[in-house]
A protein has these predicted regions:
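Bacterial N-terminal signal peptides
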Residues: 9-20
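Ligand-binding cleft/hinge of the Venus flytrap
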Residues: 45-50, 62-71, 114-116, 136-140, ...
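Sec/Tat signal peptide C-region and signal peptidase I cleavage site
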Residues: 21-25
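Short, hydrophobic alpha-helical packing/hinge segments within bilobed ligand-binding/sensory domains
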Residues: 61-62, 83-87, 175-178, 184, ...
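Flexible hinge/capping segments at coil-to-helix
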Residues: 125-144
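Extracytoplasmic small-molecule ligand-binding "clamshell" domains
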Residues: 26-100, 107-108, 168-169
Length: 195
């Protein structure tokens, strides 16, 4: 399926042009607000003690870099992955952690790269309902799920749009529940966050 190379750590999908332009016009940038996929452990997830915040390895990295730059950062829960993307696209949030680089996303966001992490995307299936998988074509004729507005790279996204029945759901738990209930044949998601 490929690696989420520029994806997860295109990690600093940042409205950098906005930041650069705003910093020059309004003075030094002193605080950033970031968000991301709240179902992405060990990288990002909602803090059970404070559900309005995200925690994880990505938050630790963002805070360390922000501290080195002398900028404050707050990493908030802005809703499911699709809403988090919309919050950045509309400028209500400054930075999006964990987006895969695609041409449509480049129209509204700048990506800082190279990525600091690659995480493999995999095809999850129900035990006892396995099927041979060697290429994208093996997914044809089956129904799959992933998160709304999730991307696995521009080439796969185009292939899926033209050849696959791939539905979007709002949460990973919903995708896996549909898989367990045999309402879908597979789930596309990254290996470590999906475990």
């Amino acid at each position: 399926m490929g690696e989420r190379g520029l994806g997860w750590a295109g990690l600093w999908v940042c409205a950098a042009m906005l930041l650069a332009g705003g910093a020059q016009a309004a003075g030094k940038c002193e605080r950033l607000v970031a968000t991301g996929n709240p179902e992405y452990p060990p990288y990002l997830w909602r803090d059970p003690q404070n559900p309005e915040k995200l925690i994880g390895a990505t938050v630790d990295l963002l805070k360390a870099v922000a501290e080195d730059l002398g900028v404050g950062i707050e990493v908030i829960y802005a809703g499911p992955w699709s809403r988090a993307q919309e919050e950045v696209r509309t400028g209500r949030v400054d930075m999006l952690a964990g987006a895969f680089l695609t041409v449509p996303r480049l129209e509204t966001m700048d990506f800082v790269h190279p990525a600091f992490l690659s995480t493999p995307s995999v095809v999850w299936v129900r035990k006892g309902r396995e099927f041979p998988y060697a290429s994208w074509a093996d997914l044809q004729g089956r129904t799959g799920d992933t998160l709304v507005n999730n991307s696995f790279g521009q080439a796969f996204d185009a292939y899926a749009r033209d050849n696959l029945t791939l539905e979007g759901v709002s949460s990973l738990s919903q995708a896996f529940q549909k898989l367990l209930l045999e309402r879908t044949d597979y789930v596309l998601y990254e290996r470590y966050p999906g475990q």
